[in-house]
Design a protein with these regions (language model features):
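Acidic/histidine-rich catalytic neighborhood of metal-dependent amide-processing enzymes
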Residues: 1-75
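Metal-dependent amide/peptide-bond hydrolase catalytic core
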Residues: 62-72, 76-79, 83-317, 322, ...
Length: 331
């Protein structure tokens, strides 16, 4: 909502000032971004020319404030993991709980989940993650700084010791692989009855150069149990990363350098999902870049109690986005 408010303010400013742009400027406010992206999907399906563009700006990255209150870096989201849910279903004979049977749907499901919980994908560097590690290294202290540099520079297999340092941070470890985790369970209808089936929802965040079909095939191999059915609940589809170079990144780098000297622009791969994935799939170079400076402490409040944006950040955000639009208009 805050990014939308800043965008509206900038559009109003451009209109009132009589600014003449050489290129079309489109404002698309879409619903359902948090729970599926139905809004942008409908536009792309029913009226794609309404959002036809070369560069799209969305939330997802942004300006990070240091402890001194100054912008220390700018995260530029150029790609994101594919959100995809799978469902595991195990079946078993029903009956009265006073006569336990060896074949039990809940036990079958529990065995499958235990296999999944003990498995971890081998680490590998997606190009966006490599660029992110290289940029973030300068912002960290040792030993993490050196470990990030070593991984970013590794031409082949990732060196073991630096990898261990980076993987000790769960948020960084998740960028090195496709992840799948159990998030919901259901099974049984009465305490005194053996369940006919038990189900688990598995949420996967898939690296953008993989597909949900590949993730499902890997789940099948991990579980290695034909009695446990794996079905797809949501078609996330492929979501290729946006180019690391081009009009969008160049304009953002120029504006950041002019307003916040010394703050690097670092490409990031988002672990979460946004509407940008649908734009990228449609061939639009979409970039996550919130113009509002925010501290790491406040960013952790997102979707939680006391979620907030400083009023000063709103004022800065208007200037950042205004400059960015004018800069993009020159490309």
């Amino acid at each position: 909502a805050t990014v939308a408010a800043v965008a509206l303010e900038v559009f109003t400013l451009l209109k009132r000032s009589g600014t003449k742009l050489k290129r079309d400027l489109i404002l698309a406010w879409t619903g359902d971004e948090e729970s599926g992206g139905a809004g942008i999907q409908m536009i792309l399906e029913k009226n794609p020319e309404a959002v036809a563009c070369e560069v799209a700006l969305n939330e997802g990255g942004g300006l990070v404030l240091g402890k001194d209150g100054k912008v220390k870096l700018a995260n530029l989201q150029t790609g994101e993991k594919i959100y995809h849910d799978f469902e595991l279903t195990a079946q078993g004979p029903t009956g009265h709980s006073s006569v336990p049977l060896k074949e039990n749907a809940i036990y079958r499901l529990a065995s499958a989940l235990d296999k999944l919980g003990r498995y971890r994908e081998p680490a590998r560097l997606h190009p966006v993650v490599r660029a992110y590690f290289a940029g973030r290294a300068s912002q960290e202290a040792e030993p993490l700084s050196g470990a990030l540099k070593a991984l970013a520079a590794a031409p082949g297999d990732l060196p073991k010791d630096p990898l261990a340092v980076v993987e000790a941070e769960p948020s960084l470890s998740a960028l090195l692989r496709t992840t799948c985790v159990a998030t919901m369970l259901s099974g049984g209808t009465r305490a005194n009855a053996l369940p006919a089936e038990a189900k688990a929802t598995i949420n996967c965040r898939i690296l953008p150069d993989e597909t949900p079909d590949q993730a499902q095939a890997r789940l099948t191999a991990i579980l290695d149990d034909p009695s446990v059915k794996i079905s797809s609940l949501e078609i996330g589809g492929e979501s290729p990363a946006s180019p690391l170079e081009g009009p969008g990144p160049r304009a953002i780098e120029k504006v950041v350098a002019g307003m916040f000297p010394g703050a690097p622009v670092i490409p990031v791969l988002s672990r979460g999902a946004s509407d940008s994935r649908f734009l990228r799939k449609a061939g639009i170079a979409a970039y996550g870049f919130s113009p509002l400076p925010i501290s790491e402490e406040d960013s952790r409040r997102a979707h939680g109690i006391d979620e907030r944006i400083p009023s000063s950040s709103l004022r800065v955000g208007v200037e950042v986005l205004h400059r960015l639009i004018l800069e993009l208009d020159t490309h």
